[in-house]
Amino acid sequence: MSNYPKYRVAAVQASPVLLDLDATIDKTCRLVDEAAANGAKVIAFPEAFIPGYPWWIWLGNADYGMKYYIQLYKNSVEIPSLAVQKLSSAGTNKVYFCVSVTEKDGGSLYLTQLWFDPNGDLIGKHRKLKATNAEKTIWGDGDGSMMPVFETEFGNLGGLQCWEHFLPLNVAAMASMNEQVHVASWPIGMPQEGHLFGPEQCVTATKYYAISNQVFCLLSSQIWTEEQRDKICETEEQRNFMKVGHGFSKIIAPNGMEIGNKLAHDEEGITYADIDLEQIIPGKFLIDSAGHYSTPGFLSLSFDRTEKKPIKHIGESAQETVTYEEIQYGNKANVKVHS
């Protein structure tokens, strides 16, 4: 792009209304309104914000979690739906925003970032390519057809979710599309010291992403609340695991430095920063891993962006409805039933 705008970005740190689609959609719209009123042009939301992250997968076995999975399934986002209509209305604040949802497509669930533009259009989505560990009991896989970067008046916008930032091939694929502003959607930072899901580890991965791909990262995370604990914790051990707070939202510049206002780990709020896309250029001079600093002669990545469907339908079904009247009174010779 020939234009390198300066503008304000925002990263949300908040708790959803766990397993309540309508209430969390309403909260999402209020947060978009708030960020837009404070001048943000691009707004990031945490991983699995609508209708909340399935924390029970880390708290107990499948029998314990099934009742919550059923609630999640019934409160997931379908496209199209009234939920998407409401989110689209929030886009009329003349902002871009990216919100991570549990999407229901057919009979399966997927972890999906939805992108809305200033007209309220749903311009695309990114499904998490591979659910992490116990998440595989909830969400199916994405593919390369849903790994977009959008060319906009505010630069090239893209996003990944949680541990997707730890995978070098994901990072390289995003670099190949010349992303400039990145939404890094995370759940919370596990409070247990040394945990691989801890805030230090997640922030380190996001800072590496910012430096490696020369992008501004809008890191957005949830927080744990007493309401969430009351919703799904059935034992004292579970409550002790799910401690209140542990958000770590922040905005990271292409040099890995944190910019903007800071939020306490147990504080709901929005962190803002004023960014200048021209600051990306020095990094491109030094690195550009998908360009002059690459070594395609012996190291390269094949990035397949075609849609991968588990079942391919060939031809069209010939099924027709034969009415009661046709069955009872019609010419039997003309009545055909297709199996």
Curated annotation (Swiss-Prot):
GO terms for molecular function: nitrilase activity. The active site is at E47, K128, C162. The keyword Transferase does not apply. It holds the Pfam family CN_hydrolase. Signal peptide: none annotated. Belongs to the carbon-nitrogen hydrolase superfamily. Nitrilase family. This is Nitrilase. It comes from Bacillus sp. (strain OxB-1).
